[in-house]
Curated annotation (Swiss-Prot):
GO cellular component: extracellular exosome; extracellular matrix; extracellular region; extracellular space; ficolin-1-rich granule lumen; secretory granule lumen; transport vesicle
Any one GO MF annotation of this record: heparin binding
Protein's recorded name: Cysteine-rich secretory protein LCCL domain-containing 2
Disulfide bonding pattern of the chain: 290-308, 312-332, 391-413, 417-440
Classification via Gene3D superfamilies: CAP, LCCL-like domain
Limits of the SCP domain: 62-200
Stated family: Belongs to the CRISP family.
SUPFAM superfamilies noted in UniProt: LCCL domain, PR-1-like
Main localization, broad class: secreted
Species in which this protein is naturally found: Homo sapiens (Human)
């Protein structure tokens, strides 16, 4: 499996994961031997820690917490421990400030996740959680689906960060953080970039295999664990307890490297992958005819914006009421009657109002409405404005959600909003976004406009979500929000050209 780049992300938070090539699974001793090629020749017995102790504890705790809560449940998920050699190998690579997986000779025996950001502080745990959040795009392959290869089903740009984190037999981790004065990230030079590298052993992401076995937790642990289980993870007490670290003594010994013979495995046969289906474009605006009734077309959530054709003024379609129109009325002729459209057609927004006791006739703008003295569902019409925005405007600023519904203008976005930094133009979520997100940068993330040309979009404010999951799409990395305190959400849609 090769490493995949999800597109250019010039600013903000980025993530990658290394795919597995599936050649061998040597032990940590080989890892040490390979690592020695990247260490300085000077003889010294002690080296500085590559990551603060509190960050190390956060990374390890979060990995084990996430591994223990996978769904469907895992029967053979092993408890993960920290490995100093993996930490040193991660530090050696992070110090190179090269935005790619490496070194090449080490990747045959370890898994690797990379993250980078600049600007405001991000803890290592933020990166780890964002890697795990790819679970939303991953579908677990059950044994009945593996014949003999398990299908690879990832509906997002990448799921291999997640699968490496929850690979059952990966039980060692070591990470490092390095601040790079300058680092080239997909063609863009970042200054003071924070580079986060995590190395894993044994490596995961083997092609055609599920990341873990499904079943009752700890029911299929390796015999070496002796039947012990902790928080749904196969667990054994470590015989070696490291000495407590202090700020003055935050160092580790460099152990000698013993000689050892290694058994090499034959390369695995890789199945050809099928091209992924492209998702259909969603539109909020529905194209209707002069005789389209509101009750016939208004179904579902995208029931508030319609494109009316020209020539409806003299059409025979009926409308009932004044101000409040009965649901069997023509949408377009009601808009002309109210005065927001003329015979040239155009956009109209609908607001549903529930039942009213009766509807009174009137003649307005050349259209005669009828009376109906019978309780029925009703709706109102309103004019759609078109508004030019910059790359920073949010739905919270423009048209926040209010019950029963809020109508936003049709928005014209400028080009190149993807290039704006996340602290000025953040994006939170996937598919449904927090209303503190940049509207136009969100439109690029959602794929409804091109970054190079910009364009028109429709937005629909909705009530808030409990969580927002970040993802990398169309070169934009959106962020996750676990417990948003305030604010609502919105959906974003393409506009028919």
């Amino acid at each position: 499996m090769s490493c995949v780049l999800g597109g250019v992300i010039p600013l903000g938070l980025l993530f990658l994961v290394c795919g597995s090539q599936g050649y061998l699974l040597p032990n940590v001793t080989l890892l040490e031997e390979l690592l020695s090629k990247y260490q300085h020749n000077e003889s010294h017995s002690r080296v500085r820690r590559a990551i603060p102790r509190e960050d190390k504890e956060e990374i390890l705790m979060l990995h084990n917490k996430l591994r223990g809560q996978v769904q469907p449940q895992a029967s053979n998920m092993e408890y993960m421990t920290w490995d100093d050699e993996l930490e040193k190998s991660a530090a050696a690579w992070a110090s190179q400030c090269i935005w790619e997986h490496g070194p090449t000779s080490l990747l045959v025996s370890i898994g690797q996740n990379l993250g980078a950001h600049w600007g405001r502080y991000r803890s290592p745990g933020f990166h780890v959680q964002s890697w795990y959040d790819e679970v939303k795009d991953y579908t677990y392959p059950y044994p009945s689906e593996c014949n003999p290869w398990c299908p690879e089903r990832c509906s997002g740009p990448m799921c291999t960060h997640y699968t490496q984190i929850v690979w059952a037999t990966t039980n060692k981790i070591g990470c490092a953080v390095n601040t790079c004065r300058k680092m080239t990230v997909w063609g863009e030079v970042w200054e003071n970039a924070v580079y986060f590298v995590c190395n894993y052993s044994p490596k995961g992401n083997w092609i055609g295999e599920a990341p873990y076995k499904n079943g009752r937790p700890c029911s299929e642990c390796p015999p070496s664990y002796g039947g012990s289980c902790r928080n749904n993870l196969c667990y054994r007490e470590e015989t070696y307890t490291p000495k407590p670290e202090t700020d003055e003594m935050n160092e580790v010994e460099t152990a000698p490297i013993p000689e050892e013979n290694h058994v090499w495995l034959q390369p695995r046969v890789m199945r050809p992958t099928k091209p992924k289906k492209t998702s259909a474009v969603n539109y909020m605006t529905q194209v209707v005819r002069c005789d389209t009734k509101m009750k016939d077309r208004c179904k579902g959530s995208t029931c508030n914006r319609y494109q009316c054709p020209a020539g409806c003024l003299n059409h025979k379609a009926k409308i009932f009421g004044t101000l409040f129109y009965e649901s069997s009325s023509s949408i377009c002729r009601a808009a002309i009657h109210y005065g927001i459209l003329d015979d040239k057609g155009g956009l109209v927004d609908i607001t549903r109002n529930g039942k009213v006791p009766f509807f009174v006739k009137s003649e307005r703008h050349g259209v005669q409405s009828l009376s109906k003295y019978k309780p029925s569902s009703s709706f109102m019409v309103s004019k759609v404005k078109v508004q030019d925005l910059d790359c920073y405007t949010t739905v919270a600023q423009l048209c926040p959600f209010e019950k029963p519904a809020t109508h936003c203008p049709r928005i014209h976005c400028p080009a190149h909003c993807k290039d704006e930094p996340s602290y000025w133009a953040p994006v939170f979520g996937t598919n449904i976004y927090a209303d503190t997100s940049s509207i136009c940068k969100t439109a690029v993330h959602a794929g409804v406009i091109s970054n190079e040309s910009g364009g028109d979009v429709d937005v629909m404010p909705v009530d808030k979500k409990k969580t927002y999951v970040g993802s990398l799409r169309n070169g934009v990395q959106s962020e996750s929000l676990g417990t948003p305190r305030d604010g609502k959400a919105f959906r974003i849609f393409a506009v028919r050209q």
